[in-house]
Every structure is written in structure tokens, then in C-alpha cells.
Curated annotation (Swiss-Prot):
<dbReference type="GO" id="GO:0000922">
    <property type="term" value="C:spindle pole"/>
</dbReference>
<feature type="domain" description="Calponin-homology (CH)">
    <location>
        <begin position="836"/>
        <end position="968"/>
    </location>
</feature>
<dbReference type="GO" id="GO:0048471">
    <property type="term" value="C:perinuclear region of cytoplasm"/>
</dbReference>
<feature type="domain" description="IQ 5">
    <location>
        <begin position="1690"/>
        <end position="1721"/>
    </location>
</feature>
<feature type="compositionally biased region" description="Low complexity">
    <location>
        <begin position="528"/>
        <end position="548"/>
    </location>
</feature>
<dbReference type="GO" id="GO:0030954">
    <property type="term" value="P:astral microtubule nucleation"/>
</dbReference>
<feature type="domain" description="IQ 2">
    <location>
        <begin position="1386"/>
        <end position="1415"/>
    </location>
</feature>
<keyword id="KW-0206">Cytoskeleton</keyword>
<dbReference type="GO" id="GO:0005815">
    <property type="term" value="C:microtubule organizing center"/>
</dbReference>
<feature type="modified residue" description="Phosphoserine">
    <location>
        <position position="388"/>
    </location>
</feature>
<feature type="modified residue" description="Phosphoserine">
    <location>
        <position position="151"/>
    </location>
</feature>
<dbReference type="GO" id="GO:0007282">
    <property type="term" value="P:cystoblast division"/>
</dbReference>
<dbReference type="GO" id="GO:0030706">
    <property type="term" value="P:germarium-derived oocyte differentiation"/>
</dbReference>
<dbReference type="GO" id="GO:0051295">
    <property type="term" value="P:establishment of meiotic spindle localization"/>
</dbReference>
<dbReference type="InterPro" id="IPR000048">
    <property type="entry name" value="IQ_motif_EF-hand-BS"/>
</dbReference>
<feature type="domain" description="IQ 3">
    <location>
        <begin position="1467"/>
        <end position="1496"/>
    </location>
</feature>
<dbReference type="GO" id="GO:0008017">
    <property type="term" value="F:microtubule binding"/>
</dbReference>
Amino acid sequence: MSAFEITVTPSRLKQKKRAEGREPAVVVMAPFSAKAIVQFEDVPITKTARRQVRVLNPSDDDIEVKVMKAIREEHNLSLEWMEHTVPARDEVSMELVWSPVLEVACKETLQLIDNRNFRKEVMIILKSKSNQPVKNPRKFPTVGKTLQLKSPTGAGKTMKSVVSAAVQQKKRMSAAAAPPSKQTWRVTAPSRPAAWAHPPPQAPLVEKNVYKTPQEEPVYISPQPRSLKENLSPMTPGNLLDVIDNLRFTPLTETRGKGQATIFPDNLAAWPTPTLKGNVKSCANDMRPRRITPDDLEDQPATNKTFDVKHSETINISLDTLDCSRIDGQPHTPLNKTTTIVHATHTRALACIHEEEGPSPPRTPTKSAIHDLKRDIKLVGSPLRKYSESMKDLSLLSPQTKYAIQGSMPNLNEMKIRSIEQNRYYQEQQIQIKAKDLNSSSSSEASLAGQQEFLFNHSEILAQSSRFNLHEVGRKSVKGSPVKNPHKRRSHELSFSDAPSNESLYRNETVAISPPKKQRVEDTTLPRSAAPANASARSSSAHAWPHAQSKKFKLAQTMSLMKKPATPRKVRDTSIQPSVKLYDSELYMQTCINPDPFAATTTIDPFLASTMYLDEQAVDRHQADFKKWLNALVSIPADLDADLNNKIDVGKLFNEVRNKELVVAPTKEEQSMNYLTKYRLETLRKAAVELFFSEQMRLPCSKVAVYVNKQALRIRSDRNLHLDVVMQRTILELLLCFNPLWLRLGLEVVFGEKIQMQSNRDIVGLSTFILNRLFRNKCEEQRYSKAYTLTEEYAETIKKHSLQKILFLLLFLDQAKQKRIVKHNPCLFVKKSPHKETKDILLRFSSELLANIGDITRELRRLGYVLQHRQTFLDEFDYAFNNLAVDLRDGVRLTRVMEVILLRDDLTRQLRVPAISRLQRIFNVKLALGALGEANFQLGGDIAAQDIVDGHREKTLSLLWQLIYKFRSPKFHAAATVLQKWWRRHWLHVVIQRRIRHKELMRRHRAATVIQAVFRGHQMRKYVKLFKTERTQAAIILQKFTRRYLAQKQLYQSYHSIITIQRWWRAQQLGRQHRQRFVELREAAIFLQRIWRRRLFAKKLLAAAETARLQRSQKQQAAASYIQMQWRSYQLGRIQRQQFLRQRDLIMFVQRRMRSKWSMLEQRKEFQQLKRAAINIQQRWRAKLSMRKCNADYLALRSSVLKVQAYRKATIQMRIDRNHYYSLRKNVICLQQRLRAIMKMREQRENYLRLRNASILVQKRYRMRQQMIQDRNAYLRTRKCIINVQRRWRATLQMRRERKNYLHLQTTTKRIQIKFRAKREMKKQRAEFLQLKKVTLVVQKRRRALLQMRKERQEYLHLREVTIKLQRRFHAQKSMRFMRAKYRGTQAAVSCLQMHWRNHLLRKRERNSFLQLRQAAITLQRRYRARLNMIKQLKSYAQLKQAAITIQTRYRAKKAMQKQVVLYQKQREAIIKVQRRYRGNLEMRKQIEVYQKQRQAVIRLQKWWRSIRDMRLCKAGYRRIRLSSLSIQRKWRATVQARRQREIFLSTIRKVRLMQAFIRATLLMRQQRREFEMKRRAAVVIQRRFRARCAMLKARQDYQLIQSSVILVQRKFRANRSMKQARQEFVQLRTIAVHLQQKFRGKRLMIEQRNCFQLLRCSMPGFQARARGFMARKRFQALMTPEMMDLIRQKRAAKVIQRYWRGYLIRRRQKHQGLLDIRKRIAQLRQEAKAVNSVRCKVQEAVRFLRGRFIASDALAVLSRLDRLSRTVPHLLMWCSEFMSTFCYGIMAQAIRSEVDKQLIERCSRIILNLARYNSTTVNTFQEGGLVTIAQMLLRWCDKDSEIFNTLCTLIWVFAHCPKKRKIIHDYMTNPEAIYMVRETKKLVARKEKMKQNARKPPPMTSGRYKSQKINFTPCSLPSLEPDFGIIRYSPYTFISSVYAFDTILCKLQIDMF
């Protein structure tokens, strides 16, 4: 019987998720706005995506926005516009169109800029994807969810879980699209019959039914066609509504036979309708419960096929279960691309999977889960209850654990099994059985419980063989059926064993179905893999048992389930029956055995005997185990106080680390980081103090202290270490070269106090301690005032203190390192340190600071102060093992491992490090292997050092295995002995218990079989009645719901039709109304347009008439104006032309003068001095001329009255003046001579210095050449000796072995003689050099003393002469002033009436005098500049000459050197060729020896194996005698088979070895070929480079010849040009004089013409304006209307009212007393203003004060004044901004936490902030060295109640807006030292903010200057970036909140502290 069920539930459309990436991005063109981001996510290539960007203008003005930085063209991104105007308070859209041509994923920036120079960046994220299908070789996605059995839940909860799983899957799904050609679900037929079969899984006891005969039934793939599901609604076909309309629910009785054809979903009319009255007779024997019988299990064929499951968001697949208590909410089994197919007897179409827009809404279940459970219990009875109880227990376990515990699994290591792969004894084998009829089953699924017996036996057999790895037993046996595509996975790869745990399975992206239920499987079971199958196989018969309630669930989205159009699926032809396999032949002949090399049964080296059976995964796993063991060996013990000499249990260590994660061996520095525990550090301090007070430290330190106090060792006087920050930094860098742990220990011991540090790598803490304790003396500072720190006495004290402590520290660290007071002995110096010796640190310190010291170590050695430590390569070597293929090849780590194993410490001292060459590595490896040989450890496999160095993998792994096996084999033997004894004692008891359990099991099995048979018969009869009743009720209910649905559908259609008609009618009515209104509006608009156009036309006519009248008058006017304009332009053009020519000549003259002036800039200082002298002379000369002229006028006037008296007085006065003039002239000439003599002296001085330098250079070159010749001779002698030694050595190799010792002795003797002679020659040369050096120093000292004497004498004579001249000049000046005063008194009495006339004449004479003096000055300047030019040319010539001489010398030396290099290269190549040939012969002999050894070893192995075989044969014969004839036959057959297998094995071994030898020879040949090709290419390159160099040298020689010729030509040309230039300057001077005269005359004429022109120009505009105004008013009056006149009158009235109102407001404001006081104050200040009280003078005075010495209180007042000025008038501090910034940073760095220093820091930080905000001073304020100071101040004042922290945060905020400064600040604040400071600062700031919030009282107002900003602004306000000039308007001066300030700068710098 069959039934159907129709469920018509309208699907609820899922609301699509809002695409945030496609929403328009908003770009606000204003500061502090959010950054816009435009996303192009997953855009297919060659497709087009569009995004919108809204540019918003929040300001009140229109702005022009331009695209300043567009996207690169290769991205193919186009913009809608590049420039646009954005209105005020409006926005503009920009469309971005992207058509990707390549697959790209990047981030770009689009930069916008407006007319206010405001920039805004838009981040554009571009991500495209390929639209080509991705070929995924993994056709089966990884199973990602475990099979879990849970208690039933409601259907609503089920649907929620499925929907949520689908949503999560969509988020995680990658974009891997399926090929478009595969659009249907299909079954792929195998290419060949199933060749791999497996043993049948046995069903559990409760499932067996021995009373039923098997029958065949068709079985179909899953998902099954929905039309055959008795408990599910079939998929709705396309003609469903028509079918339902034609249905007639008439009861009828119909049965369907076995051979009835398959019913398709479209043939709905053929479905039978169950009746209530129908009586169907069914035989009890034909009706069987849904259980699995053993017969069906034995005969059912099964094979694995694959089909493609494409994407579908929701796929409804029903599960055929009778148990209604199962709810779909429980976790489902993953569904992959591989499913199980059971061949049916006839074809069956697969149902289509239709695509939905979203998941269907959850349906409310018709019945509760409790009711379903009760009904099932009622129907099935006790077996179902047993099943439910058993499933409760199984549901508590994970599927892996349940499957793993099914077999007999001895857990050797007591470890939890996480996956099936770890179960050595669990295997699942499947065989194909004959297909059976499934009469009553709707689905068949495999059961794992029935396979336990077979799996245990199979695994136990494999585990007993020593050839199999226990870990590999459960991996290779599971084989899936062959598939068509060779790249697809096998079925066992799709099992749950691929996932390591439940968590990982849960995360994978899979589709889940519900778990199998054993009680619902009927007569047959489909085979399954080692875990729950990927998809359950479904089968159905014609008489399937129906179910009253439909059960549906949805599959989550996976990579394999992609969207596709619904198409019918194809089923392969089932006419071909699969073949039956008896056993799995692949199980016993596998390609890879993977033996466990670390098993107890493995006694032969597996890496030399069976590597051909190992796959790469197994080898990689073994290498990982070896790496873990080696890292554990070389690791420093965690307990540093442990005894390092205790023997390490190597075998136990390997077992411990094998199951752990790989931990790389830490270095000594990493281990020292954990050395900060209190006990260990205190112990270390105690040992260090004992060492410091020991006798070997006390004596040298005492002597050094005495020397330092006596100033025998002292710091240079010009080095103030406590004030020189640069020198402090240098010393600090030297000290930080030490390891922080050692440095901390040394500082604590030397200074006698503990250093509080967070860790041993706290560099900031160490630096702070050094700066505060080494470069400062707190005792002295506390004893005296702060001014004492600036005195010389304190400087000497601190120098002694610093020098003494540094010397103590270096000696202590050297001794402590040698004594090894730290047990793990870390390096004394850090690895990146440039110095590796304590002696280097001392020498560097002495060269920087100490005075009058040559070699300080020689001085200190006499005091017992000797530094010996030197850090070697092995001290810094990292022994961690990361790659076995590389790490063991140098031999260093291998030697360290041997030291650890053999408890030795003398091996690493013999190493050759760094091991660069192959010989060094071979030596190191031989050293390690030799140590093993000395310990009586024999290595097998002929492992040589060359194999390890060459990276031979098998021999390297064999070496490690032998080391491990050496220590593990005794434990294996002991454990095996214990197990054997125990097993022999308990074996009899085990056999007896097994027999008892077997009898009891058989008895229970028979009883259970009888009970089951009786119960099943009773239950089946009961179930038939209930089944008939339920089917009838279901049919009635189905009819009722169907009829209701049809009625509802008809009602819905009617209602929908009515609504449609209503909408259409209302739309028609509304359309008519709008049409009528539109017609009326159009007619009105046309009428208005007609009137307006008529008015415009009238206006145009009037304007045309008026224009015609105006044109006639304007033509006449224009003609007259044109004539006047042409004439005037002609006259003016001629004048302008003349002026242009004169100006052009003048400009050309000025250009020439300016070009000549540029050459004078280098001597500007001397010229200024000369200019001042010339001006002084000019002034005196002019005064003299004026006096003489006035005297002449006076005598001329007085001669008319008293001629004689006037003549006499004039004569006397003339004589006096003449004498004065002569004296003045003499003085001037004397000054000129002196000046010229000084210039000549300087010139001679420069010539002498140049000659002296040249002489010194020649001397140096000569001495160097002499030294080079000597060294060359020594080199030739040495080379000759070496060649002789090599020749002798080669000859020695050819001699007999008996003379080897004698020749070696002879060679050694020769070497000693050569060394002795060379040393003797060296001493002789050094003595000569020292003598020459001494003589040279004496000569230089005498010469310098003589020159210094001459210089001092010349300066004295010059000073004496100048003093005499000054005295003479002073007396003459005094006399002249007296006479001049007398003369002026007489002159004033006589010439009072004629003063005006004289003034006029005097003005003319002064003008002429000025012109003459100007001409004289120009002449002097020309002469002076010409002389300077001449001097410069002479210098240039001398330099060129000297450079040419130097180049010639260097060139000749280089040529000689090149010849020697070529000769040396030829000899070296010949030597290398001979050596290579000889080494090749040696290597060939060595290989022959190795081959002979291997051959002998193989022969011995064959003999040994044959003897073993004979022994076994004898033993087998003895056993055959003991056993029966049957045992003899079995053993004989086994022996024959073993012999045959051995022959096959031996032949295989021979073939493999031959193949290995051939492959290795081929690889070696290829390697040699590659080396030869490489060397050949290198030789070709060298030849090419040598030939190119020869050509270059030849070209260079030609070039130098041409260059010398060119220099000669240039010299002649420049001399000629200088002559012409001097001539041209003279001509120009004459031309200029004539031009000036013409200019003056022309200027007078120009003035007259210009006056006339100005009069005409002033009159014409007024006339034109009046005329144009009259005409404009006339036109305006013609256009005026009454409305326009009213509007104009209103505007005028409004302007009058506004004018009166504004005047009233201004007058009212002026009555304000404050404004009046300010005005009075300004007027008073203007009257009292003086130049001394100006702001600039105050700034200069403050800067001078700060440059000198000062005290803190005075500096505070000055800095306060500068703070105010830098904020209000920052431009006045531009000239001193660099000094102010440096000074403020220095004050902040030196300040402490006192109140005065706090105020100093506050003022300094504000000054820097004000200067940083001003654009012209920002560059000088930013200093990279100041970042350290700012960071220290932030850390120091972050938790104090002060404005310093907010001010410095504001300063960083201002700096961070510049990209370059932001990068520098980011780099500094992200280094390891600054990270600590930033974290501490953030923590303290947060604590301060929390304390403020928890405080009961409000915090007091800060005493800052700008405290009012907290009232006006919120705590999250950003400070201004521009200077506010003392007025806070829109932004606060600094940050308000400290927490917000620090978070803001961290965000701006993109620093994440978490």
C-alpha cells in the first residue's frame, strides 16, 4: 500500500542582508571628521562594479573640490569627475566605476583637496575574484562534524539550528565556484568492476533473525526520490495544481505488485488512495520488522560511487525512520560528495532539488515529541526501549571514542585516543555481497557494532608482525571503491578519522544529516567506512511502510553544494552486476609498510634497511621526533641550580618529548630572562659581592683608585661628562654593549645598591640608573646648592667619580665572566654589540675621555689591572635544531649533543668555527664521531663524516636512531622479560575464563533467539492492526486538509482578483485627475511664455533703436579719440622705446654686475670691513672739502670789507688746512699700505701652507712607497718560500710512506726558519721606522716653534705700530676739533644773513661731490673684485696642478699593482687546478674503498641470513616431529611459500639496489655537470670583466690625455676672456657716464611732458564719467517702471535705517568704560613707547640671559615672559626658535621633580608647543633627540596633578599631523625601550583618572595659565593645530582629559598596546 501527503506551506522570503560595502561613502570636507571607506568586495574579473561617494560641505561657503591624488591606472578605476563645486551646506555625489582586468586585493587612497587647501583621504579597498572555475583536486570536502546522538527536541528548535548553521556556513564559505558544465546530479559509473572487497560487518545480536529467508529488493542512492518516501511529502511537480483539481477522493482498495513500474512525481494521478473500509490480508511471514538479518548482511553487494552534489541553499532530504521521537534538531552527519550506491533491479529517476531564495521558516509540529515517543514505544515495545536506553549511554561519548572502543585495543601508553587513526587495532573491512530484496525497509544504513570480532582478529594478526607499525595498521587497509576520476579521494579518506577532535570537526564547513538508527534498518545494511558514512544510502520497495508524519530537515551550505538550476538527475544503468570479492588483496601487499623504528621489536636500523618502504609522511614524522629529542638534549635545564654533570637518561627523555609539542632549545639570553626570581638573584648578588671583595679584585681596584685621585688617570678638561649629553650617550652606548643581566649585576656591586627593574631586559631602568648614578653625584648635590653643580670643583669631583666607577665596572665584569658566577654562563656582550672584548671597551673609553694616555692597557697592567675576556663565536652560537637537513651538517650541534651524552666539556674547544668550508665541517663531524668511538660505541652502516656533511638523509637518521637505540634497548629487554613472566603465569587462567564466557554467551544467544521469535510474531500482529487504522485516519485527514487548502486557494484567488481590480480602477481615476491638472498647467504656462516673449521682443526693439542712435555719436567720438590715441601712442611709444633701450642697457649692465658680484660673496666679510674703512675715509674727505669751500666763500665775502686782513687770515688758514690735509693723506696712505701688506702676508701665508702640505704629502707618499717596496720584497720572499714548500709537499706525497716523518720534520724546520727570519727583519725595520719617526718629530717640533715665534713677533710689531698711529691720530683729531669749533663760531657770526643761499649752493655741490665719490667707490670696488678674481684663479690653477700630479702618481702605482694581481691570479688558478685533480683522485679511491666495504658487508649479511634460514629450517623440522601430520603439511606449505616469497624479496632488493645505484650515479653526474657549467660561466664572466677593464683603462688613458689638453685650452681661453672682460667693463663705465648725462636731461624733459599728460589724464576721466553717467541715467530712466522705483525707494530707506541703527550701536558701545580705558591706555602707551621697551628687545635680552649662567628663579620669570610672547607674537621668535627648542629640551631633561623644576618644565613645554603651532618655526622645534625627553616627561608627570602631561600630549598631537614626523615618532615609540614607557604611562594615566572618579571632593582647579578652557570645552575636545595668539575661540589650548589625550595620540600614531 502507498500513501501520499501534501504539505503546502508558503515559504517566507528571507530578508536580504544589507550590503554595507555598497552604501554610499560620506566624505565630510571638515577637520576631525571620520575617514570614508569605499569597498569593492569580490568583484568578478571583466565585470563592472559601481560605488557612490557623497562629498559633503558643512561650511557656509561654496568650495571647489579637486581630486589631487587619483588611483593608479593599472587598476582600471574611473571617477565621475576630477573637479567639482560643492555648494554650501550641500553635497555632491561621485560615482566610482571599477572594471577589474586582473585578480587583485589591495588598498588605495583617493585624496581630495578644496580651495581652502584642506585635504581629505578616501580609502578604497579593491578585491576582485576570478570568474574562471577553480579546479579543486579535492573532490570531497573534509568532513567537519561528528555524529552525535541527542535527546529529541522540538521542530522549531531544529529549524533554528539548521538556519543558524546555514548562516554561519555562508560566512565561512570560500568563493570556489563549480564548473558550469556540471549542472546536474548524476551517478558516476566506475571505470572497472569493484576490485576491492571487505569482510562483511556482523550485525549485533539483537538484530539477528534466523527464521527469515533473504529476498532481493532494489536499493537506490541517497537522496531518495521523494515520491517513494512514505513519511514525507513528495516534491511538488509543475502540474500539481491541475492534478489536485482533478482529484476525486473516492475510497478504493488497490494493491501494487512487485513488478510494478516506478511512479514518477509528475504522474500524480496514478497514486493509490487508502480507504478506511478496505481489508487487506497480509501474511505474517511476508511482513518483517525493520531489522537487519545476518543473511542479508552476508549477501548484500555494496560499492562506493561518487556523484556531484551542486550548490543549493536548502535541500530537503527526508530520513525514513519509524521512530518519531527523533527530531531533526540534533547534530547531523556531514554529507560529502561521496555516497553509497546500492544497485537496484530497475532504474529510478532522482527527484529534483529546487532552488530557494532562503531557508523555509520552521513549521510547528503537529504532535509533541513526548507523544511520538510514547507511540513508538507502544508500537515497537521492549526492543525500542532497550535501544533508547543503550543510545543514552552512547550519546555521552564522542563518535571517535565509540568507534575506537569497539575493537580490542591495548593502550600501551595509557593515552586518550582522539581519532580513529590512533587506534592500532581498529579496522573496517567491507566486501560486496549479493543484492537482496528489502521488502519492508525504506532506508538501510551500516552498523559498526557488528564488525568487532572480525576487526579485532584482523588487527591482532597485523599487530603481531614486526614488519608493521602499530600506528599504521589502521590506515592502509581501508580501501574505497575505484572511481572514474583518479584525483578523487577514496572512501576511507572521507571518514571521521580525518578530524583530530570533535571541536575541529564541528568547525568544518559541512552539510549534516541525522545519525543512523539501528532499529530502523531492515534486512540489509550498506557497508560503511571507518567512521559514519558521508551520506546514508536509501532504499525503498514497492510496498514501503508509510509514516503518518513528515520529517524534513535542511542541509547547510557547503563548498560542494552550490546553487544550480534544478535539473533531473541521471542514474547509471544497473544491468551490470558488480563482482564479488573474497578478500582485500591490497591489504597484504601494500606499497608502504611504515615500520615503527622506535618499537621494541625493531632491532635493525630501519633507515638503512627499509627506507624504500617508508613514505614521506612517516619520514617527516620521525624527523620531528628526532628534532624534539635533540632540542631537549641541548636545552639548558629549567632548574639552573641543578647539577649539570648528572647523567641524562636519553631513552626516557626521548619517550617524554616524543608526545609533546616541538620546543626549540632556548639560548642563554632567553634563559637568563627567567633568572629574576628573588632567591636566585640574591644568591647571585652574594657571589658577586664576594668576588668584588676578594683579593684579586681589591688590590687592582685600590691602586686604580689611588691613581685616579692623584689625577695620574684623569678625564680631559674639555670633557664635562656631567654636562655633555652627547658624551653621556656615547658612554651609555658602550655600557649597553654588555648583557643587561651582567650589566645590572656589575652596577649593583660597584655602586653597592640594588636596582629596581621589571625584568633583566629593562634597558630604560639601566639607562636611568647610569645617568643618575654614574654621571651625577647625589651626595655632592645634596650637600651643596644647585649652583655648585656648575662649578669646576664639582666637575673635577664627578670626573673622578665616573672614571673610577667605570674602571671598577669593567674589571669586575671581566673577572665575573672568567669565574662564571652565573651557572648557565650567558654571554657578556649582546650579539649585536660592535665590541666583543672588554679591552676594546676600555680603549674606546680612553680614546674619548682620558687625557695624555697612549695605550691605557700598558699603564693599567703595571697596577695589576688586566682585562682578558673575549667573546667567541661558540659563545653566541644557537644550538636549537630547526631543520635536521641543515643543522647537523656543520658538526657544531652534533658535537654539543655528544658532550651532553658523554658528559664531556672538551669537545667544543677543538671545533673549527665558523665552519665555512667543507673541510672544516668534516673535521667537526669527525670530532663528534671520534668521541663516540672513544666511548666504545660502534656505529653501523658505514656512517662517515662526509655523509653527515653532505646531508645524506638515511645515514643521518640512522646515526640518530642508533644513538637512541643504544639507550632504549636495555629498557626494552627488561620490559619484555617482565611481560613474558607475567603472561606465562596468567595464561592458563585466561584460557579457562574465555571458555566459560563462550559457553555462557552461546546459552544466552539461543535463549534470546527464542524470545525474539515469539515476541516479534506477537508484535507484528499487533502492529498490523494499528497500521491499518493509522493509514485510514491519515487518508481522511489528508482529504480534509486538501479540500480546505483548495477552498482557501480559491478564496485567496478571488480576494487577490478583487484587490487587483480595485487598484486598477483607482489608478485610472487618479490618472485622469492628474492628466486634467497637467493640461491646465500647460496652457497657463504657454500663455505666460507668450506674454513674456512679447515683452522681451519689445525690449530688444527699443534697445536696438537706442543702440543705433548711440552708434552714430560713438563713431564720431571714436574717430576723434582714435586719432588722439594713435598720435599719443606714437609719441609715447617712441619715448617708451627709448626708455626701453636705455633700461635694457642698464639691465644688461646690472646683470653683468650682479654676475660679477656673485663671485664676491665668498669674501663678503672682508669686503664689509674694507667698505667701512672707505666710508670713514669718504666722510673725512667730504668734511674736508666742505670746510675748504666754506672757507673760500668766507674769504671772498670778507675781502670786500677787509681785503688785507682777509687775505692774511685766508693764507694762515690755508696753510693749516694744507698741513692737516697732508697729515690726513699720509695716514690714509699708511693705512692702505698696511692693508695691502696684510693681504700680501695672507697670500704668502697661504702659499707657504700649500707648499708645506704638498711637502708633507710628498714625504708621506715617498715613505709609503718605500714601505710598499719593502713589503713587496717581503711578500716575494714569503711567496717564494711558500711555493718551495708546496713543491716539496707535492713531492713528499709521491715518496714512500717510511720517509713521511722525516719530510714533515724538514718542512716544519723550514717554516720555523722563515718565521724567525721574517720576525728578525720586522724588528730591524721597526727600529729604523721608530728612529725616523723620532727624528721627524724633533724636526717638526723645531719648525713649529720657529714659526710660532715669528708669528708672535709679527703680531707684536703690528700691535706696536697700530698703537703709535692711533695715538698720533687722536692728538691730531683733538687739535682739529678745537680749531674747527673756533672757526664755526666766527662763521656763524658773519654768515647769518646768507644762510639760505649757501644752503642752496651747498646742496648742488654736495650732489656733485656725491657723484664723484660714488664713481671713486665704483672704481675701487672694480679693482678690488678684479684682484680677488685673480687670486681665486691662481688658487684654482695651483689646485689643478697638484691634483694632476697626485692622479699621475696614483695611476702609475695602480698599473704596477694590476700587473702583480694578474700574475698572482694565474699562479693561483694553476695551483687550484692541480689541487682539484689530486683531491678527485683521493675521493675516487675513497669511494672505491667504501664500495668494497659495502660489498663485503652484503656478502656477510647474505651468509648470516643463510645461516639463520638453515637454523629456522632445523627448528621447523624439530617442530614437525613433535606435531601431527596435519601440522607437518601446514608447515611445509608455509615453508615453500616463504622460500618463494624470499626469492621474490631478494630479487626485488637486487633490482632496487641497482636502481638506487643508477639513480644516485645519475644525480651525481647531473650535479657534476651543473658545477662544471657554473665554473665555465664564472670563467667566461671573469674573462669578460678583465677584457672590459683593459678597454676601460685604455679609454681612461685617452680621456686623461684629452683632459690635460682641454685644461690648457681652458686656461688660455679664460685668460683671454678676463682681458676682454676688463676691456668691456671700462667701455661700459664710459658708456654709463654718458648715459647718465642723457638720462638726466631726458628726465627733465620727461617731467615737463608728464605734467601735461597728467593734467590731460586727470581731466579726461571726469569728463568721460559725467558723459557716461548722463547716458546711463538716460537709458535707466527709459527702463524705469513704477514698481522698480518703489523697490529702489525701499532699498534706500532700508539702507538709511541700517546706517542710523549701526551708528546708534557703535555710539552705545563707545560709551563702555572699559573700551574708553583701553583707548586711553593705548594713547598713553604710544606716547611713552621707547625702542628699549619693544618686544624684540625684550626677546633679545631674554635670549642673552638664557645663553649665560642663571638660577632657576630668574629663569622662571624669563621663561614665563617668553611663554606669553611665543603664544601672542610667535613671529618675533623665528630667529631664535632653534635655540629656544634646544634649550627647552635640555632644561626638561635635566629637571627634577621639585616645584621650581615643575614650573620650568611647564613653561618650556608651552614654549615648544607655541613654536610648533607656528608654521615658520615648526621645523626647528621638532628634534628626534627630544623624543626621549618627551617620553621621559610623559612617564614622570602622567600621574601628577599638573598640565605638563596634557601639554606634551598636545605637542605630540601637533607633530603627528605631519606624515614624516608621525613616522619618526611611531618608529621611536614602537621600539622595545619605548614600549615599556608607553605601557607604564598608559597604566598610570588610567589609575589617575580612576582616582579622580572615586574621589569624594571635586578635584581642585589646576594652577595653569589657561585653566579656563576646562569650563568652556568638553573633556573629549581636540586642541587647535593653529596658533590662537592668546585667545581661545573654538578649540582648547591643550587636551582637557589626560586619558583622552594619550589615547588620541596612540590612535593617531597607530600604536596598539594590546
